[in-house]
Amino acid sequence: MATETRSKSALIVGLFALAIALGSPEENSLFAQEPSASKPAGKIAGKVRLEGGFRKAAPFRVFKNREFCGSEVPDESLLVGPDGGVRNAVVVIAGIQNPKAQAGLRNFALDNRNCAFVPHVQVVPVGSEILLLNNDPILHDAHARMGRETLFNVGLPSWRQVKKRLSREGIVKVVCDVLHTWQSAYIVVTSSPYSAVTDKSGEFVIEQVPAGRYDIEFWHEKLGKQRRKILVQEGQTSKVEAVFSCASC
């Protein structure tokens, strides 16, 4: 009986020690590296705006699969609202290196829909997988480049789905090589856990940003890059605006 009691006591002590070594579930989770409600945090809200006139791009002419795609498709490279708000601009808080804070918490996809990539622009954490798929009844392709380097080139019949991992930071341009010359999309891969893409009004919101001073980077496929400084204070909304001009677009 004494031997059995000692064995049970040893087992309990061992399990207790193991629990201390492993830590709590929150400490070992990817979620633990995200800002929590108990930490001082604020919000960033802003807008990307185009100042001055610009020439609205003409639609692309379609040369292949016109029976499905039609004779032309819209050019999504510069979408501007009535008050100058720029859609599909990427906003990233620079200087926060925390790739685990969001990686794996969301599903990312690039679809072929109505002869266009959807979404046209997205931002994903470095290390994420992206699902490539095709909801059109015609053959598509996803040819991804970072600069001049090909990351992947995948044929996509309507039945095929493929996952690809994005393991490096940078701007990835995706095109369709199946003579769909108008098709393009951009995937911005970042290690910052705080990012956004502007909506149709050119606006964005980034929640739960730890209090502090930051640089914010703005990028748009046609308008280029800008950087702004911002102070985030606990419980407050910090406002920022990036204004671009369009000399060559």
Protein language model regions, located:
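Short, low-complexity, intrinsically disordered N-terminal modules
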Residues: 3, 28-29
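Extracytoplasmic copper-binding redox domains, predominantly the cupredoxin/blue-copper superfamily
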Residues: 30-249
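Short, positively charged
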Residues: 8-9, 107
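N-terminal secretory signal peptides that target proteins for export/translocation
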Residues: 1-8
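Bacterial N-terminal signal peptides
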Residues: 12-26
